[in-house]
Each structure stands twice: as structure tokens, then as C-alpha cells.
């Protein structure tokens, strides 16, 4: 099984173990921000234990910047951004894609960017503007953008292959 597939499974399972995962807790270190940090920390601990040399955490995407990917798997040329607020109309969707394009431009072998969001992220990111950005990233930069939605009770993956590509 590819590392990314296994890692996505771990991310989904970790979310299902947190009873308040689907709730909107609000901003703040003791609320939503703290819950997100706890979730990311758990995922990172499992990844570090399972793949100490294959999965890079907080990977510097663009040299001489503070632009990092949450996770990067060099052998699969894939980055993962845990962007739980993707379901909000204003999120880091465009910024994360632009970061990936800058990383490619700087020479990072990157063919796939996976964005992890909470429930309703898939619906929001299937709106015309988001689809246009995804298609442009593929057509102009051969960068496949995927949005995966996780929820405590279930998981849904966006059926969104890049144009002309089938799994």
C-alpha cells in the first residue's frame, strides 16, 4: 500500500477517535485552534513512528520562506496540508495551492497536493471557482489537487481526478 493511502487512513481514524472533531469550537488556544493542534500532533506522532525517514513533517516547501507543508512524502511526490477550515468560504485553499506551485517552481518534485478538511469541505471546494483553480493547476502545472473530507463518523473523498487522468 502506498504511504499516502495508509497515511490518509490514519488521518481518518485519528479524527474518528476525537468525539468533538466535527464540532465548531470557535477560535482560541483552548478551543478550535487547540483542538486542531491536538489532532495534527496525534497524526504527526503516528507518522513519525511508522515512517521515521519517509514522511517529512513541517517540510519547508519553499527555501528561505516560512511556507511549510504539514506532511511531505518525497517517494510519492505528494504533500498533505491539514486545512480543517476548507469548508469555510474564506480558507487557506488558494494559499495552499499557490504554496505548492511556488514549491514546484523552486524545484521540489511535487505532483500531488492533498488538502484535508472537515465535513462540507468537498461541497464547498466543488464550487465553480475552486474547480477552476484546481483545473488550472493541473493544466498549467501538472499539479493534481485533491480535497479529502474527514468527519468523526465517516470519511468522504472528493471524486475529482485531474482532467484526462484515471486512477
Which residues does each PLM region occupy?
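Acidic-basic catalytic patches of nuclease active cores, encompassing PD-(D/E)XK
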Residues: 1-58
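Conserved catalytic cores of phosphodiester-cleaving nucleases, focusing on short active-site segments
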Residues: 71-86, 100
Amino acid at each position: 500500500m502506498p504511504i499516502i493511502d495508509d497515511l490518509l487512513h490514519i488521518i481518518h481514524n485519528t479524527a474518528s477517535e476525537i468525539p468533538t472533531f466535527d464540532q465548531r469550537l470557535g477560535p482560541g488556544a483552548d478551543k478550535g485552534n487547540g483542538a486542531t493542534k491536538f489532532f495534527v500532533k496525534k497524526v504527526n506522532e503516528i507518522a513519525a513512528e511508522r515512517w521515521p525517514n519517509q514522511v517529512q513533517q513541517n517540510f519547508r516547501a519553499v527555501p528561505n520562506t516560512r511556507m511549510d507543508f504539514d506532511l511531505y512524502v518525497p517517494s510519492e511526490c505528494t504533500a498533505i496540508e491539514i486545512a480543517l477550515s476548507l469548508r469555510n468560504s474564506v480558507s487557506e485553499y488558494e494559499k495552499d495551492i499557490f504554496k505548492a506551485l511556488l514549491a514546484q517552481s523552486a524545484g521540489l518534485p511535487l505532483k500531488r497536493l492533498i488538502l484535508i478538511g472537515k465535513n462540507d469541505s468537498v461541497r464547498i471546494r466543488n464550487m465553480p471557482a475552486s474547480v477552476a483553480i484546481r483545473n488550472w493547476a493541473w493544466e498549467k502545472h501538472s499539479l493534481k489537487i485533491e480535497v479529502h473530507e474527514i468527519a468523526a463518523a465517516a470519511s468522504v473523498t472528493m471524486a475529482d481526478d485531474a482532467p484526462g487522468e484515471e486512477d
